[in-house]
A protein has these predicted regions:
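Acidic, contiguous segments within the catalytic cores of piggyBac-derived transposases
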Residues: 2-9, 18, 22-50, 56, ...
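Short linear clamp-binding motif
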Residues: 13
Length: 524
């Protein structure tokens, strides 16, 4: 059998060049998707075309205004365009009438897997060491002044004079940079400006200018009495949150970074006063041009900024991070992956982890994460993908589906307990502190018996269902009165989302304080 021929690098490059030259390809860029599509369809001689959406070439540009009608308060549910430019790669017909035999496809370098020892799974459900537990304590014992605060006083604890002064200073600086030397702003103007923004969340009109209209069907005396239309438009034009002269390289959110940091500080001003915490994603609606904009298929909000949120099971936010995509800085890359980095970063605000339990979904959960959190005395539970359990020998899904409803199987390696439960679908949950016992009952509808039946449900799954939805509750509260005032600034949705979240946080504190003082009230 003849041996394989070995090629030199120069010979390989020459061969690739010859194959590439056999296909005529024209590469052109267009500013919009519509123009790119028209160009691709107009070429009758092309064998095909690849349309590529390119990200912006500069992420820290000083210009932050977009070509939208900010007077229109009823935005489209779909973006008119995407970030950056659109590239069209047109493939010409092969001169020989044959497809090329190979293509040179570049792939990103894969993350190197960690060489960690495999756990030894067993049927004995016992941890090698229990995580200590403490009571989280009463919020009023830590902050007794809260019982005398009105809802307005609580909101002022989040949007306080210091934060509003920062907005005043940066807005005046931005106006001077735009050569407007006459623009002035004070904290009182900011208060009225924020009130009008909040008003648009529960009293929305089709167009912004209608708030100052004198027609009886749209007239709102409160708005026109406290601030004129031109003054509101002027403040919205120059409102700013950062100094353009002190930009941060490679930070896509430098215009709102300090604002988000200040809000997180205020969310944590009373400490972490809830026992049950959850971590999940949240979307802020945004249909403009920015490289941090995300698309989530199948979500109620498909286009927008993606937030990672640590919240209580009642919907109080403690820590918020905006996801900007994969970081180019190696220092920001976690050797364990994105989910591990997000969880550990959000939990940095938890000063006494033995007082809390954390829940998250299968995007984050892995055996390595639960083991790392256990070493930090953080009690955590989450749904999990079975390929992240390091060879845990749970029953295969197709076999478990044939078992009776409510059947479950569990394994433990001394650090993590993994359980798989047969419900409507097979569900896998992993925990570093929870247990299977006591096994409870869950009501389910039986199609064969035409009635509700009770099936066994492990304790860890019941606890997960009970405490996981905190971020979803927060998202529902915020969506109820989301501000509708729009702006041409790309960071405006994050700005108004912060205002909205601060109001929800103040309301959740107010509800919790009233429940402490008047326990007969029903929590909402």
């Amino acid at each position: 059998m003849p041996g394989k021929r070995q090629y030199k690098v120069a010979e390989v490059l020459q061969q690739l060049a010859e194959e590439h030259s056999s296909v005529s390809e024209d590469f052109e860029e267009y500013p919009t998707l519509i123009e790119a599509a028209e160009s691709a369809l107009a070429n009758d001689e092309a064998a095909g075309a690849d349309v590529v959406l390119l990200p912006p070439s500069i992420v820290d540009a000083l210009s932050d205004e977009e070509a939208i009608d900010d007077n229109d308060m009823m935005p489209s549910s779909l973006p008119l365009d995407v970030s950056g430019r659109v590239a069209v790669l047109v493939h010409g017909n092969n001169s020989n009438g044959e497809e090329p035999t190979s293509k040179n496809t570049s792939r990103g370098q894969k993350r190197q897997k960690l060489d960690t020892p495999q756990p030894k799974w067993a049927n004995r459900l016992a941890y090698s060491e229990d995580i200590p537990s403490e009571n989280v304590g009463n919020l009023l014992d830590k902050e007794p002044q809260l019982k005398d605060m009105t809802p307005f006083d609580l909101i002022s604890r989040y949007f306080d004079a210091q934060l509003k002064t920062m907005i005043v200073e940066e807005s005046i600086r931005y106006a001077r940079q735009k050569n407007n030397m006459n623009f002035e702003l004070d904290v009182g103007d900011v208060d009225i400006f924020l009130c009008i923004i909040l008003l648009s969340g529960y009293h929305s009109l089709p167009r912004e200018r209608l708030y100052w209209n004198r027609d009886e069907d749209v007239c709102i005396p409160f708005v026109a009495t406290h601030m004129s239309r031109n003054r509101f438009m002027e403040i919205k034009k120059y409102v700013h949150l950062a100094d353009n002269d002190t930009t941060v390289a490679n930070d896509k959110l430098y215009k709102v970074r300090s604002y988000i940091t200040e809000l997180n500080t205020r969310f944590q001003q009373f400490g972490v006063f809830n026992k049950f915490l959850s971590i999940d994603e949240e979307m802020v609606p945004y249909y403009g041009h920015h490289s941090a904009k995300m698309y989530l298929r199948g979500k109620p909000i498909r286009f927008g900024f993606k937030l990672w949120v640590l919240a209580s099971d009642s919907g109080y936010p403690y820590n918020v991070e905006v996801y900007c995509g994969k970081s180019a800085n190696p220092e920001n890359q976690s050797e364990h992956g994105l989910g591990h980095r997000v969880v550990t970063s959000l939990l940095e605000c938890v000063t006494n982890p033995v007082c809390h339990e954390v829940y998250f979904d299968n995007f984050f959960t892995s055996h390595s994460l639960l083991s790392s959190l256990r070493a930090m005395n953080v009690k955590a539970t989450g749904t999990v993908r079975e390929n992240r359990l390091k060879g845990c020998p749970l029953m295969e899904t197709k076999v478990m589906k044939k078992k009776e409803r409510g059947f479950y199987e569990s394994k433990c390696d001394g650090q993590v307990i993994a359980v798989k439960w047969n419900d409507n679908q097979c569900v896998s949950v992993a925990t570093n502190f929870g247990s299977i016992q006591p096994v409870g009952k869950a009501k389910r509808w039986s199609a064969s018996k035409k009635c509700s039946v009770e099936i066994p449900q492990p304790s860890v799954i019941r606890d997960y269902n009970l405490h996981m939805g905190g971020v979803d509750i927060l998202d529902r509260f915020m969506a109820t009165y989301r501000p509708m005032v729009r702006s041409k600034k790309w960071w405006w949705p994050l700005f108004t989302n912060g205002i909205n979240m601060a109001v929800v946080a103040a309301w959740r504190v107010h509800v919790q304080v009233r429940l402490y003082l008047e326990p007969y009230l029903v929590a909402q």
